[in-house]
Amino acid sequence: TLWDNRPTILKAEIDTRNWIEDKVGEVQWGDFNDFLSLREELIKEDASIEWDISKLRKEIFRKKISHITPSNLRDEIVDEAFNIFINKRHEIELFDGVEEALNFLSKKYVLGILTNGNANVYKFKIGKYFKFAISSLEARDSKPNRAHFDKALEFVDDISFDQMLHIGDHQVNDILGAYNLGIDTLWFNNNNEKWSQDFPKPDEFKSWDILPRIIENKYE
């Protein structure tokens, strides 16, 4: 929602794979369906992988270089590969207007991050605007399930779900998850997607430049 995650993840993945292949030779990575199948296989072996995506990433690397021996060498390569990936994963470019909007809103509201990912917002200059950040690892679950939202209540005093606003770009993980709990929502729709859910479409915006004005008009 704050930056375009897709090119960031893609570049991190490609750079990490190239580094691994420089170390061990060509690796059969497979396509996205192969990734999903391997993910399901790993979850059957360790249910926590469903919400611990850092562990998921490491275990995928480990599976892909399972032919490397001894095991301690394989583990070293996996750990170093993950460090490369996670560092690259934090090389982001914020959407226009994000920092200005957060600076304005943080002076009037308590702001928090709820993410299914493993980016650490406090590594970015915008981290100073957020009172809390909850990942899937900390929630031990993933949106649209309610664990993230329940945990958010621990960081705010005397606030209930009907006094919250959740802003997100994913129709299910962000909007449906909040809607089911009676949390107000705003949909960040910068790609002009069609609304495809069977519950009412929330207010939407496509530019962070106008978000403060939308919130002021909505609540003040």
Model-based region annotation:
Residues 1-96:
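N-terminal helical cap/lid subdomain that shapes the substrate entry/recognition surface
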Residues 24, 69, 108-109, 182:
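Glycine-centered loop/turn motif at secondary-structure junctions
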Residues 91, 108-111:
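A general structural signal for well-ordered secondary-structure junctions
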Residues 6-7, 99, 103, 110-220:
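Asp-based, Mg2+/Mn2+-dependent phosphohydrolase catalytic module
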